[in-house]
Amino acid sequence: MKDFLKYTCASLLGTFLGLLLLGSIGLGGLVLLIALAASSSKDSGPQVKDKSVLVLDLSLNITDSKPIRSPSAAIQDVLSDDPGNAVTLRTVLDSIESAKKDPKIVGIYLEGSSDSSSSGFANLKEVRSALQSFRDAKKPIFAYQMDWNERDYYLGSVANTIAVNPYGSLEINGFSSQAMFFTGALEKYGLGVQVTRVGKYKSAVEPFLLTKMSPENRQQTQKLLGDMWGEYLTTVGPNRKVTVGQLQAVADNGGTLMADEALKSKLVDKVVYFDEIAAELKKLTGTDRENKSFKQISLKNYARIAEDKKSTLANKKNQIAVLYAEGEIVDGEGGPTEVGGDRIAQEMRKIREDDDVKAVVLRVNSPGGSATAAEVIGREVMLTGKKKPVIVSMGNLAASGGYWISMGSNRIFAEPNTITGSIGVFGMLFNAEKLAANNGLTWDVVKTARFADINTVSRPKNPQELANIQRIVDRIYDRFITKVADSRKLPKNKVQEIAQGRVWSGTAAKQLGLVDEIGGLEDAVAEAAKQAKLGDNWQLEEYPKRRSFEEQILARLSGVSVLKPAAKLDPLTAEVKKMQEELAAIESMNDPQGIYVRLPFNLRID
């Protein structure tokens, strides 16, 4: 309650001060104030000291696109010690690449934290490749953590020196995916569910019908986890000079090693306290006079410097547009964390008609969603591809509707651990008949045609109505696989075999012909430049343009911290939050026909 009041008061205070400022000095004065702040920002911005170490916080949540911050949230960022832990993939990649060439940067420190990152493994794969390139440039990487988990260790294993606290541990216990089923709860509260679907592996409807995984869903999930776990082992092993068998043995025999056991197994290089690793970094950088520690700069601060350097070298006439499609695909404009069909289609049209944009990279990180919205976007992708190269870069997941919007491009890149496929269609129909009856509610209807009230939630659909909806689902599925066959130049009968709603890893998708290349966002950008014959003479522009004028103002502000960072969630609260996220997915189901092309609900891999 105390933290709630602090954040609420801070939000109200920020709003009040903003209004007071505007009322006192007027709009012109405010603009002048902003201009002065902008002109002085170069002097007050971050600086890199000679022989500094770039610090990458392993708890950062690496996303594709910039997070949208509400005004109140942005004010909280200013007042808080914690400005948020989200950072874009391109920010991380560009910073590491700049640091590799920067004579003032002598190494990278991967800083562990008690907070765990929620970054997807496909994004981590590309960051890891960038770190490996940094190491290959003969610049050292140090990594330290109290307790190493698999996600952090995936990056940490690339380091020249991996250290763990004497009382710490290292976890390598394999991947798991645990699904939540709502069937019992829906029955308890009187909510009815009916489904129509095509594809025996299209398991998105299972949480609402079953109480456990179907054999088909278990089979596909096991294969997917096996592919991703295999990629993990073959990636981590070589840097540590341990075999896949040795790593698997760790996972099969408890999965958690104490510090001394991790050292004995050659999975870490040192068992030390933080002050000891800091002393080692001081030997590399010398002592910073201000903070008495090693000379350092955080990745977020360094990114600001790297961005300023890039903007001065930009070629405005030769642009490669990176359009982000991140989140649930929904009909209409969509919210800030959704892929709105109309909004993204409009962005693609704008890019297509911009003569300065010579090529497009569509970055997809979506489980799918509305079939209608997916087709709206897919059409614009296809039209743009006829005018200029469109390259798709699949992120952590590009499944079902996410694949639909990708397949019309000129070339598709995916990481080995991208989750894709799920070529299937379903309809999900809720009714509140029992819930209403239990609470004394009734309905009556007057209609002019037999199917006039087919969209009502007052009763279940009758057999004729279900047959009509199933017919629509069947037709959309047939169109889906036909589009896949045409765009991927595959026989339709082969597409029918590999579709059925089944999810695939990027590696498997490449073997099946669903993607063209194994690679990340940087590879896709390079391919776009190659197809557009731009050489090195181009500038990258990101879409949609998300940062508002108001946010730019707030980002310039600095002040004394009056708030504490948000506390880490306890396990029970974290589990409740997961359940809320599962249920929130239902709110995004707004297809006008009630037909969806979507991955299994909130597939989680831990």
Indicate where each model-derived feature is located.
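Short, contiguous alpha-helical
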Residues: 262
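Cleft-lining beta-strand/loop regions that shape enzyme active-site pockets
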Residues: 45, 54-180, 311-435, 474
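Short acidic-hydrophobic, aromatic-tinged amphipathic segments that line or gate anion-handling sites
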Residues: 163-164, 268-274, 414, 515-521
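C-terminal structured domain segments across diverse proteins
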Residues: 329-330, 334-588, 604-606
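Intrinsically disordered, low-complexity segments enriched in small/flexible residues
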Residues: 1-84, 90-92, 166, 176-259, ...
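Surface-exposed aromatic
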Residues: 112-116, 247-250, 503
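Short helix-initiation/N-cap motifs at beta->coil->alpha
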Residues: 147, 252-257, 398-399, 501-502
